[in-house]
UniProtKB/Swiss-Prot annotation:
This is Acidic phospholipase A2 CbIalpha. Heterodimer: presynaptic neurotoxin. GO terms for molecular function: calcium ion binding; calcium-dependent phospholipase A2 activity; phospholipid binding; toxin activity. Ca(2+) binds at Y27, G29, G31, D48. It comes from Pseudocerastes fieldi. CDD domains: PLA2c (cd00125).
């Protein structure tokens, strides 16, 4: 769920998810359109695509089993749907962590009205 995803983001970036990523670029946060603004925003685009491939559950609300071990995020569900959601969140958190050095404060609270280019396909 979004709370667990936020914990993963904090674990990998040291940033508080809601403040730093809830309205970042064209894809971080609810929905998305246009072209990703940078590598961080691209992580969110890929995450949106991943959620789009998860069928049969509500990825934003699904509560899954996860733990943090030696700096890694471990998804522990046997339920295929919950595990898929966890893996989407895990991959995005890792991606955000790998791109934290290029995080651009100019894209915080970015207006979706600036995201008018044709959207990429997943």
């Amino acid at each position: 769920n979004l709370f667990q995803f936020g914990e993963m983001i904090f674990e990998k970036t040291g940033k508080e998810a809601v403040h730093s990523y809830a309205i970042y670029g064209c894809y971080c946060g609810w929905g998305g359109q246009g072209r990703a603004m940078d590598a961080t925003d691209r992580c969110c685009f890929v995450h949106d695509c991943c959620y789009g491939r998860v069928n049969g559950c509500n990825p934003k609300m699904a509560t899954y089993s996860t733990s943090f071990q030696n700096g890694d995020i471990v998804c522990g569900d046997n339920d295929l749907c919950l595990r898929a959601v966890c893996e989407c969140d895990r991959a995005a958190a890792i991606c955000l962590g790998q791109n934290v050095n290029t995080y651009n404060k100019n894209y915080e609270h970015y207006s979706i009205s600036h995201c008018m280019e044709e959207s990429e396909q997943c």
